[in-house]
């Protein structure tokens, strides 16, 4: 993942919060139980938290309210600008992405919501290998994202979106890199993590991986 999605992020920045509130019918199911998904990620995190894809700051705010020390990473200038307006004065968001970032301190938990699918499976593998080097034993990765049980589940979801006339959603599912649970499980395990997957809506699962 380089900067190829930054234009999309900048365009989406000013309408993102309306998306997560379910105002776009095509993405209503993707963002179903959005607040509960964020809370679940917060509850599974601890200590110093590195957040990738801060976006407009929704998860960041909940992490801060829960007493976490948060280091935010966000590639989009527009997203960073909106997030800074919503977050406490003085909170710093650093430009970067899942693979290119600076770590200012010891990290206990790495979190992200609705973003890891911007990486190819090969890039996901490289990222998790990198995080494995950052985390001590007991450290965690907690990612919430659209992921599929298997190829059949993915194919059925794309077909259903097309049948419902949700062509933007179908195109999104076919353009980005939404992976399968067995692939992610293999990536986590080979990099020294024990991982569990919890489904929170039709699309989104929370991946909780603990460094062994």
From Swiss-Prot:
A Gene Ontology BP annotation from the UniProt entry: methylation
EC number(s) given by UniProt: 2.1.1.-
Keyword check for Methyltransferase: yes
InterPro entries, per the entry: Methyltransf_25 (IPR041698), SAM-dependent_MTases_sf (IPR029063), Uncharacterised_MeTfrase_YrrT (IPR023553)
Tree of life domain: Bacteria
Keywords, comma-separated and alphabetical: Methyltransferase, S-adenosyl-L-methionine, Transferase
An example molecular function term from Gene Ontology annotations: S-adenosylmethionine-dependent methyltransferase activity
CDD domains: AdoMet_MTases
Positions with a binding annotation for S-adenosyl-L-methionine: 53, 74, 97
Family: Belongs to the methyltransferase superfamily. YrrT family.
Function (record text): Could be a S-adenosyl-L-methionine-dependent methyltransferase.
Descriptive protein name: Uncharacterized methyltransferase Bcer98_3087
